[in-house]
From Swiss-Prot:
Residues 204-230, 358-374, 594-611, 685-694 have a biased composition (Polar residues). Residues 194-203, 672-684 have a biased composition (Basic and acidic residues). Belongs to the GAB family. This is GRB2-associated-binding protein 1. Residues 5-116 form the PH domain.
Length: 694
């Protein structure tokens, strides 16, 4: 053991070097603090493998100690509630973990007493109450500073070894400034008026009804509230009210919930109308009817199930719009209309006075489709009428008093007139109605299904008019197969036939594409699965845990440079160290002396493992390969060239290049001689180990 008086000894956990704080364990070692004031020996801190070991693992010279910090925190699970202090030397920082706070304070007090350290005034992260100014018998007054209660208790428990200097009084504010801001200050917030979110709710409502093939759903609300909306779907963004012919706007009664539609336009007739004042305002026609929004929709949900869903993708079937006389005069197809427009139908009477042929009245809810209506026509037997009977209508109207609006479709370009005209003529000849939606009770009698490839239902003759609204997307025309009309059943409502107008009809999906997904047996309940092996990857140095950091209760002690000048580092700092612990072998090293002469370095590296000279010590420049050129022309003197040896063995000549004449015969002879010598040498070397084997 080293000489000196033993001041303090005990068990401490020592940290590995700074670069190995996480990968290496913190070993428990027996530390001995020795003071050499009486004996003249240096002040050292030794640590041993155990308390009865003879040789220390390492000796820390306290003359090289610069600072001592107590009360550190380390972001590691096993050191959450530990008492850590460090000894900062020139060579390395030693982090030591004590078993209790009293033991940590004892070690710090003894080390600071030997080194002559005082608490540092320029510590920016010092906590309130960590000053250690009060003696042990005088407790700190920590009631005035609530954040410093924990610190004051720990500071009062440790008696100071010497008279400490005063600390700055405003430490509480410094500690608070260092803490990160976990809360958001209201000063940094900026109040802003939220934008109306009603349009988002409407757009969400429209997407929820996409599977109902519903492009235009009547709004069962008051007209004043529905005017503030933008639209239910993506096709008609500008209008929320659904259009109706202006000729009927004046004739309908205000308090009636049943509307009369004009007779069928499939007889090449267009009613004579006059433009109203509301047509210039976006063609919004408001019908003030009793609205029962909250009670109607839940009661009428079952009614929408009995109606047909039009199978044509991306289209809605609406009642054609009437036009002013000036607009109708510009069309070319109207010349072929032979009939005279019928008179305007009378005002609606009580439901029992009307027949199903005279009127078409269907209550519709928000989940209903726009194809749920029928156009009455003259001369059609009541038994084949595609309308719901008057008795059923009365029952429906008694259950729900909702307003009903009808949207008249926009006109089509002239290139679609041929298909629409043929479709109109077919209805005229066959004298059948458009396939409307009926209830489930009359499904066997009045149901006329649509062909999936059928065009949109238009009951007016083909007339051309430029599209007036920019947001209107025309329906996709299709070739109508009259032979199969009414022979196929439309797809169910859950198929969701709604797409863009450019989307082609859906093709039948092959069976191979409908295979179920593979079964994941790991999802089986109570299945015992072998867990995957834990993949442990070594962390790079920059991802490893950092060293223990300073906390609000950290106290730092350093030497006063004016009173205690730092002694120069001795040459043989580690000369007294001996290693008896293989775990700390990385700590034992021989420092390099920068004043070592070249002769000493050669002597130091003369002995190697194989007994020869070390190739690392001997310079490579001693052995050089020189190249000679054959001067075959004896009469011509070639000046010598300087050769430069590169790493690959090739010579790099100077800027001046000399050319010589080579005798081909002599060169070939030299080449053959060299090859023969090389072959003979290789054969000799290959025969030698063969003889040894025998």
């Amino acid at each position: 053991m080293s000489g000196g008086e033993v001041v303090c000894s005990g068990w401490l956990r020592k940290s590995p070097p700074e670069k190995k704080l996480k990968r290496y364990a913190w070993k428990r070692r027996w530390f001995v603090l020795r003071s050499g004031r009486l004996t003249g020996d240096p002040d050292v801190l030794e640590y041993y493998k155990n308390d009865h070991a003879k040789k220390p693992i390492r000796i820390i010279d306290l003359n090289l100690c610069q600072q001592v910090d107590a009360g550190l925190t380390f972001n590691k699970k096993e050191f959450e509630n530990s008492y850590i202090f460090d000894i900062n030397t020139i060579d390395r920082i030693f982090y030591l973990v004590a078993d209790s706070e009293e033991e940590m304070n004892k070690w710090v007090r003894c080390i600071c007493d030997i080194c002559g350290f005082n608490p540092t005034e320029e510590d920016p992260v010092k906590a309130p109450g960590s000053s250690l100014q009060a003696p042990a018998d005088i407790p700190l007054a920590i009631s005035t500073a609530p954040p410093s209660s924990q610190v004051g208790a720990s500071a009062a428990a440790a008696p100071p070894p010497y008279q400490l200097i005063s600390l700055p009084p405003h430490l509480e504010t410094l500690g608070i400034q260092e803490d990160p801001q976990d809360y958001l200050l209201l000063i940094n917030c900026q109040s802003k008026k939220p934008e109306p979110t009603r349009t988002h709710a409407d757009s969400a409502k429209s997407t929820s009804s996409e599977t109902d093939c519903n492009d235009n759903v009547p709004s069962h609300k008051n007209p004043a509230s529905s005017q503030s909306k933008h639209g239910v779907n993506g096709f008609f963004q500008q209008h929320m009210m659904y259009d109706s012919p202006p000729s009927r706007a004046a004739s309908l009664s205000v308090d009636s919930s049943l509307y009369n539609l004009p007779r069928s336009y499939s007889h090449d007739v267009l009613p004579k109308v006059s433009p109203s004042s509301t047509e210039a305002d976006g063609e919004l026609y408001v019908f003030n009817t009793p609205s029962g929004t909250s009670s109607v929709e839940p009661q009428m949900r079952h009614v929408s199930i009995s109606y047909d869903i039009p199978p044509t993708p991306g289209n809605t079937y609406q009642i054609p719009r009437t036009f002013p006389e000036g607009t109708l005069g510009q069309t070319s197809k109207l010349d072929t209309i032979p009939d005279i427009p019928p008179p305007r139908p009378p005002k609606p009477h009580p439901a029992h006075d009307r027949s199903p042929v005279d009127t078409c009245s269907i209550t519709r809810t928000a989940s209903d489709t726009d194809s749920s209506y029928c156009i009455p026509t003259a001369g059609l037997p009541p038994s084949r009428s595609n309308t719901i009977s008057t008795v059923d209508l009365n029952k429906l109207r008694k259950d729900a008093s909702s307003q009903d609006c009808y949207d008249t479709p926009r006109t089509f370009p002239s290139d679609r007139s041929s298909s629409l005209e043929g479709f109109h003529n077919h209805f005229k000849i066959k004298n059948i109605l458009t396939a409307g939606s009926v209830s489930s009770e009359e499904l066997d009698e009045n149901y006329v299904p649509m062909n999936p490839n059928s065009p949109p239902r238009q009951h007016s003759s083909s007339f051309t008019e430029p599209i007036q609204e920019a947001n209107y997307v025309p329906m996709t025309p299709g070739t109508f197969d009259f032979s199969s009309f009414g022979m196929q059943v439309p797809p169910p409502a859950h198929m969701g036939f709604r797409s863009s107008p450019k989307t082609p009809p859906r093709r039948p999906v092959p069976v191979a594409d409908c295979e179920p997904p593979p079964v994941d047996r790991n999802l089986k309940p109570d299945r015992k699965v072998k867990p995957a092996p834990l993949e442990i990857k070594p962390l790079p140095e920059w991802e490893e845990l950092q060293a223990p950091v300073r906390s609000p209760i950290t106290r730092s002690f350093a030497r006063d440079s004016s009173r205690f000048p730092l002694s120069p580092r001795p040459d043989s700092v580690h000369s007294t160290t001996s290693s008896s612990d293989s775990h700390d072998s990385e700590e034992n090293y021989v420092p390099m002396n920068p004043n070592l002469s070249s002769e000493d370095s050669n002597l130091f590296g003369s002995n190697s493992l194989d007994g020869g000279n070390s190739p690392m010590i001997k310079p490579k420049g001693d052995k050089q390969v020189e190249y000679l050129d054959l001067d075959l022309d004896s009469g011509k003197s070639t000046p010598p060239r300087k050769q430069k040896s590169s790493g690959s063995g090739s010579s790099v000549a100077d800027e001046r290049v000399d050319y010589v004449v080579v005798d081909q015969q002599k060169t070939l002879a030299l080449k053959s001689t060299r090859e023969a010598w090389t072959d003979g040498r290789q054969s000799t070397e290959s025969e030698t180990p063969a003889k040894n084997v025998k």
